[in-house]
């Protein structure tokens, strides 16, 4: 029966050739409209965490983007993450399903409504409770609920910043890393780090980086990289031995007034992740979600050691 269920899932849903999950306005049902790639059923258990930066980077008035507002790009990235999580689960043997997807905001929101939305985005499947309907609700939930979250944050207009540094110091091991899983952390951020309660400086290392800091450090002119290396600039290491964590950074949005800005952000993040022993990471600029679909798919659905051993 279990084999039959899994077989039906693959036959029915890999034939879909559309692009999103949408609700049917005439009923409680929804129509599933995106394609599932055909993957090996022998796949690692996935534990995917997403850390959202709800600072003023998402403010469409302060940072307008005619092609697509940055908060809508985030929503598109979240939808793509959910779609690939669905594809991963759909392709696994039912008896081996044990996979998780969750979203975090740091600092934790005081708004109970927002906490309820975050809780709704905490999804897990195992062989005892997985159903076709629950799997296929994932991208719809992520699309609709994340849109409401971003719109509420913009309407509230109280951007306290995102404490990315402290999350990686105090919470990432407890919240995002579990034994027996392939642990992935996706960070949606413009690449700058700042929170009013986490401002520390150790020699030329900091727990923050803003466009003003880049300019103040002299990283807006030729020779910036030599200075960066000689003085040992960078982020203060927030943790050590995160070798069981893979990190995908999406949404880098450098200040266009400095031609070196993107390179500076990339060097800061790369050095930081390497020093924390993150072995697999990618850092991607803010692009349209349609252009990022393959990047996200390749990172989440890549062939793993478990598959190679089968």
Residue positions per predicted region:
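Von Willebrand factor
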Residues: 43-122, 126-180, 184-186, 193
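Scaffold/interface architecture of coatomer-like assemblies
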Residues: 103-107, 126-141, 195, 202-212
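Bacterial Sec-dependent N-terminal signal peptides
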Residues: 1-39
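Von Willebrand factor type A / integrin I
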Residues: 21-23, 212-310
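Flexible, glycine-rich surface segments
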Residues: 162-246
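Extracytoplasmic/secreted cell-surface and envelope-processing proteins
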Residues: 58-62, 111-114, 194-198, 257-260, ...
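Charged, often glycine-rich, active-site loop that binds/positions anionic groups
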Residues: 108-130, 295-307
